[in-house]
Structures are given as structure tokens and as C-alpha cells.
A protein has these predicted regions:
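Internal maturation/activation junctions in enzymes
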Residues: 304-412, 421, 545
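Short, small/polar residue-rich loop motifs at catalytic or cofactor-binding pockets
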Residues: 268, 391-394, 458-460
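C-terminal motif of bacterial Sec signal peptides marking the signal peptidase cleavage site
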Residues: 14-15
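Extended C-terminal subregions enriched in glycine
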Residues: 403, 453-455, 488, 497-546
Length: 579
């Protein structure tokens, strides 16, 4: 058995109203004929951005371009996401002002049990759990694609999948980031042993090299069937049976069945919006962690001392994270299964009070009690604690089309290469390890406990920000597991308060404050100075030589569209000038 994967992976990864609203939010109607800023796409791989631009040049909607880009990402960046996983898509329709949140999160099989990752009273080792069949949830990406396309798409359904089909058939050059993973994964995981995965990533027993031409006819065939026959070709029949067979295989087989796969439905969830100064942060509701963006921004404002010192602002940002993460970890889960006090958590009166519960720098923050604060009716006794870790096998893309419609989309297979199990040309997710793993059947259960048909909590936080007039201002999002709320909040605060450009906010050192310690990315200026100042203030600082963000953001300025791709990955920005 190959062990110690998680630590090695981290080492490699371094190389509106604040209350919940009905399913849609509406911004003031935009002047479509007045949109003269062109179009833009940014994502984690040039092939994906090229696919998005190709679709936009054909008159496609931002949703069409997002589907095309992500279908390509599943091919060229399989370590991060794909059609064997799921995602969240936040859509802004400029003509109507509507915001729509499409939830393609994976769901637990009907045979899932609350203690399925417990063995003899102990939690199954994370690496074993991660690569097990138990970890596979029903993939939601394809169903989310179709739901979003049916509602927003302009081009025919087969057209949006054609770039990925063409690239899988003709082949593409293996990127350095993908190639760099493979020797380490061979040494410390089962990727080089898993049927299908081994033959694809290690032809002849040797890992693919950067620059190798790689074709995936299985993937092309799967997408061709979905394009021609509809998503039933994925969720019923041979492809679904292949997914179930892979999930039920040894070692540590799972219970996922073809019937579970056939039963999958995407969800259309509420969009939540909250104020930051005179602007509005709009984001995805649970099971995502988008609400943490609203919480961090509000808490940051309350914690500011009035000082112009950037060091004081960073300290306020750290404390805002610490409080928001504690509440997120306690209360967020699947809203279909758990009564999440989201309105209370985002209530301005609660957030104002919560900011007064500032913890000593060396202390571990505990969750607040919004029900007690607002009504004298405690929320704290509802759930057990949960400190679930999430690995960083995720991707994000941001797109604006020529009409000013926008998409912020984050997608994942959870850990790098998911479970490393292969079916029909793609890797299968390990999303079930996003649930609370350590659970007693006899004790109070976390909000994020496993249950049949339940969607695990996610840190993914696709967000769209509007200015004081309700005009589109910013699109942001990132991969990064539990660090996603911190990564995304950095760009929001960086652009809207620290005066940074899109690229400056992305390039700025990442600062993550979940729990007792504060991680600071010291290999990026001024990371070391930030770490030194926080240490002097008494914080328990972990200095990190790199973080695994993959921020792809767009800021709308008077001059045009300011896009940024995270240099920590392989992304680019491309624009189409206005007519």
C-alpha cells in the first residue's frame, strides 16, 4: 500500500439582501445595447480558453462557452475536474438582471451509511478512503451542463461539446503541470495500478512526459454519445454501468449502483447576495461555501480599526476568516437534508455582533450562535463538530460574453485525479470524502454527515459582484479545497478595498486562517513581511512556499475588461474586442 500521499500532494501543489432569497436574484436590468466591452474568458489551461473563445465567436452565450471550456478541462486537466465529478455554475443574465445558481454537486449512493468510513471505531485512513469505491458519488457535471444549456444556451447542444470531442480525437500536448504529477502519483498512489488510468497515464509503464501527444478516444466517444443522444446516454446504459462497476471494484468497494446514477438530478438553488460597502457580493448558496464570502467581507468591515495601515487591514482580514470559517464548518451542509440557519448567519445584526467575539491570535475560534444572538433561541446545539479536510483537485473559470452575460463556474473531482478510478474515458470523483468522516452512530451528527442521496458540503464559492448601480463589476472563484473561501475573499477585498488590479489581487500572497493557525504564502512578495507582522501580533503562523489557488477573475472597468489568470497554474486570459 502506498502511503503519505496527502503531504506529498501538498508539496507538489505548491510546484443584495444578505438573507437567502427565492431561487433567483435580480439585479437592475442592464442596457444590453450599451454593452460595448467585448467578451473575455479565463481558465486554467489555454486549450479550455481557446474552446470558450471559439464558442463566443460563434455567438454562443457565456454558458455555452463555460460548458465547452470545462469539457476541455476534463480532458487536458484531468487531475482537477471532469465529467466524472461535479461543480457549481453561477450565471448572470444581463438582459433580465437574473442570477441563477446551477448545482451539479455529486450525491451519495443509496447504500451510503453515516459511518461508512469508520472501521473498528477508527476512521479509514484518508488516502485509503480517498482512493476507495466508497468515495465515489454520482457525477453531476453532465446534468448541470444540460440544465444550464437548456435555460441559457444559444448554440445547439452538440456544438458546445464539439471542441472537446475534436481535441480528444486529434490529441493535445501533455502540459507540464499534468506531467509533473505523474511520477509522484506512481510512487505514492494507485494511479499507475488502476485499470484504465494506468494504461492512459503510464503507457508502457512509464509516465507521460510534458509535450507528449495524448489522445483519448474513449472520452471522445462518451461526449459524442452525450452530444447525439442526450444526457440519458451518460446516466443510463453502458456508461452508467461502467461507473458503477468501477465504484464496486476492490480495494474498499463502494455501493454506487447504476440505479443511483439514473436517479441523479441537478438542482437550481437560491443565489445569495450581501452588501460590501455600496456593492453587492452575489454567490452560491449551500451546499457551497459561497456564504462565507459574504460573511468574511462583512466581518472584515466591522473589524477594521480605521487605520490606513495595510498590516492592520491584513490582520482584520485574518480575523474575519477565522470567525467565518468556524461558522461555516459548524453549520453548512446539504440544504435539502439539513436545516441550515443561513438567514441568521448572514444577518447584518448577527455579523455585527459576531465581530465583537474576536479571539486571541493564538486561540482556536469556536462557532457563533446566531439564533441565540438574534432571538434567544440557540442554534449551537443542532450539530456536532466537523473539521473535514478537502483536497485541492478543483478548477475555476470565469467568462463574459459579447452581450454582458457572465458565468462563474467552479468544478471538481475533489482530490487530484479523484479516486484514480477510470470509466469510459474519464476519472471518477472521491467527493464522498468531503463529508465528515469521523462520525458516531450514537452521537450528535455534524451538519455535513454522510446520508443516502445527500450532497457533501463544498468549499467552492463561485461569485459575481455588482457595483452600487447594479452593474456587473467582478467575477471570481478558485480551486483549493478548504482554502477556497480565503483565496476568493482575497481577490474581493484586494480589488474592492486594497486598490489592486485583477492580476495584482490574484498574485498577492494567499493568507488562509481556518482554525488555530494562519498560513501565509511567503515565497510571494510581500508574504514574508505579512508573516513576520502576524507573528509579532501573536498569531500562530505557518509559512508556506506556495499555495494551490487557481484564481481566474474578471473585473469590469471603465476602460474595458481586466482579466487575470493565476500564475500558480497554467491558465491564460483571452479577450474578444467590442464590435
Amino acid at each position: 500500500m502506498k502511503r503519505n500521499l496527502l503531504g506529498s500532494l501538498f508539496a507538489l501543489l505548491m510546484a443584495c439582501s444578505p438573507a437567502q432569497q427565492p431561487a433567483d436574484q435580480t439585479q437592475p436590468q442592464a442596457d444590453i445595447e450599451g454593452w460595448n466591452k467585448g467578451a473575455i474568458a479565463t481558465a486554467a489551461n489555454p486549450h479550455a480558453v481557446d474552446a470558450a473563445i471559439e464558442i463566443l465567436q460563434k455567438g454562443g452565450h457565456a454558458v455555452d462557452a463555460a460548458i465547452a471550456a470545462h469539457a476541455v478541462l476534463g480532458l487536458v486537466e484531468p487531475q482537477s475536474s471532469g465529467i466524472g465529478g461535479g461543480g457549481f455554475m453561477l450565471v448572470y443574465e444581463s438582459e433580465s438582471g437574473n442570477l441563477v445558481f446551477h448545482d451539479g454537486r455529486e450525491v451519495a449512493p443509496s447504500g451510503a451509511t453515516v459511518d461508512m468510513f469508520m472501521v473498528d471505531g477508527e476512521v479509514l485512513g484518508f488516502v485509503d478512503a480517498w482512493q476507495s469505491g466508497k468515495a465515489i458519488g454520482v457525477p453531476g457535471a453532465i446534468a448541470m451542463y444540460k440544465a444550464a444549456h437548456d435555460e441559457h444556451g444559444h448554440l445547439p447542444w452538440p456544438d458546445v461539446l464539439e471542441p472537446a470531442i475534436r481535441l480528444a480525437t486529434e490529441g493535445f500536448e501533455v502540459s507540464p503541470r499534468l506531467a509533473n504529477y505523474l511520477p509522484m502519483m506512481a510512487a505514492q498512489s494507485r494511479l499507475d495500478e488502476a485499470p484504465g488510468s494506468a494504461e492512459y497515464f503510464y503507457p508502457g509503464g512509464n509516465p507521460l512526459q510534458a509535450g507528449d501527444l495524448l489522445k483519448n478516444p474513449e472520452y471522445a466517444n462518451t461526449l459524442t454519445r452525450v452530444a447525439n443522444e442526450g444526457i440519458e446516454a451518460f446516466y443510463r446504459g453502458e456508461i452508467a454501468e461502467a461507473i458503477a462497476e468501477a465504484a464496486q471494484a476492490e480495494p474498499n468497494p463502494g455501493s454506487l449502483t447504476a440505479e443511483d446514477i439514473a436517479a441523479y438530478k441537478p438542482a437550481r438553488r437560491p443565489v445569495i447576495c450581501g452588501p460590501f460597502r455600496d456593492m453587492s457580493i452575489c454567490t452560491s448558496s449551500p451546499p457551497s461555501s459561497g456564504g462565507a464570502q459574504i460573511m468574511i467581507a462583512a466581518l472584515y468591515d466591522h473589524l477594521l480599526t480605521g487605520s490606513d495601515s495595510q498590516a492592520d487591514k491584513v490582520a482584520a482580514f485574518v480575523d474575519a476568516q477565522r470567525l467565518a470559517y468556524a461558522d461555516r464548518d459548524e453549520y453548512f451542509g446539504d440544504p435539502d437534508e439539513v436545516d441550515i440557519p443561513l438567514d441568521d448567519l448572514l444577518n447584518p445584526d448577527y455579523l455585527r455582533y459576531r465581530a465583537t467575539e474576536r479571539f486571541e491570535p493564538g486561540a482556536t475560534p469556536t462557532p457563533g450562535d446566531p439564533g441565540q444572538v438574534l432571538r434567544g433561541d440557540s442554534s449551537a446545539a443542532l450539530f456536532g463538530s466537523d473539521t473535514t479536510e478537502e483536497a485541492a483537485g478543483t478548477t475555476h473559470l470565469s467568462i463574459i460574453d459579447g452581450d454582458g452575460n457572465a458565468v462563474s463556474m467552479t468544478a471538481t473531482v475533489e482530490a487530484p485525479f479523484g479516486t484514480q478510478r477510470w470509466a469510459a474515458g474519464f476519472l471518477l470523483n472521491n467527493e464522498m470524502t468531503d463529508f465528515a468522516l469521523e462520525v458516531s452512530v450514537d452521537e450528535e451528527r455534524p451538519a455535513n454527515a454522510v446520508a443516502p442521496g445527500r450532497r457533501p458540503r463544498s468549499s467552492m464559492s463561485p461569485s459575481i459582484i455588482f457595483d452600487s448601480k447594479g452593474d456587473l463589476l467582478m467575477i471570481t472563484g478558485s480551486p483549493g479545497g478548504n482554502s477556497i473561501p480565503a483565496y476568493v475573499a482575497k481577490t474581493i477585498v484586494g480589488v474592492l478595498d486594497w486598490g489592486m488590479s485583477a492580476q495584482e489581487s490574484v498574485d498577492h500572497p494567499n493568507i488562509i486562517a481556518r482554525g488555530e493557525s494562519v498560513r501565509v504564502e511567503v515565497n510571494v512578495e510581500p508574504g514574508q513581511a505579512i508573516a513576520d507582522d502576524l507573528k509579532a501580533r501573536g498569531y500562530n503562523v505557518q509559512e508556506r512556499n506556495g499555495e494551490n489557488s487557481g484564481l481566474h477573475i474578471i473585473v469590469v472597468t471603465e476602460e474595458g475588461l481586466d482579466g487575470a489568470a493565476d500564475k500558480r497554474r497554467e491558465g491564460i486570459v483571452r479577450t474578444i474586442p467590442p464590435n
